[in-house]
Amino acid sequence: MQLDRYDRQILAVLQADGRISNQELADRIGLSPSPCLRRVRALEKSGLISGYRAILDARQLGLTLMALVHISMDRHTPERFANFEQRIAELPEVLECLLITGQQADYQLKVIVKDMDAYQSLLLNRITRIDGVSGVHSSFVMRRVVDNTALPVI
């Protein structure tokens, strides 16, 4: 999909405030409401806008421990990876799972839990019990320096 400056402005504004009214969005980017809404609908239909979400405060939910977890697999087969990916996607504590290269690991997970006891339980009772997991290395987040979900569009 070819994006013009209005589309890029729409995307930038919606990434910052997905609940903005169409009228306010149109005012901000300099279009009238009808063409603005048509553009938003076209961006949604194309899949470029894949959804709208609320961003929750983890601390207020009691989720205070975040870890980056490197997972090594025993065999590098499509079946082994597919099984791991299916099983890891079932764990609500896993915020992100990336297949990586350049490390002594196959996957990097970003997980969030209540405390170290909850992390130990997640690791020992669920993650390491997935077939094929042969090694785990954890690093704990001390502070989020950049925490941005917006993609560069301009």
Model-derived segments and their meaning:
Residues 1-154:
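A compositional/biophysical signature of low hydrophobicity enriched in polar/charged and small residues
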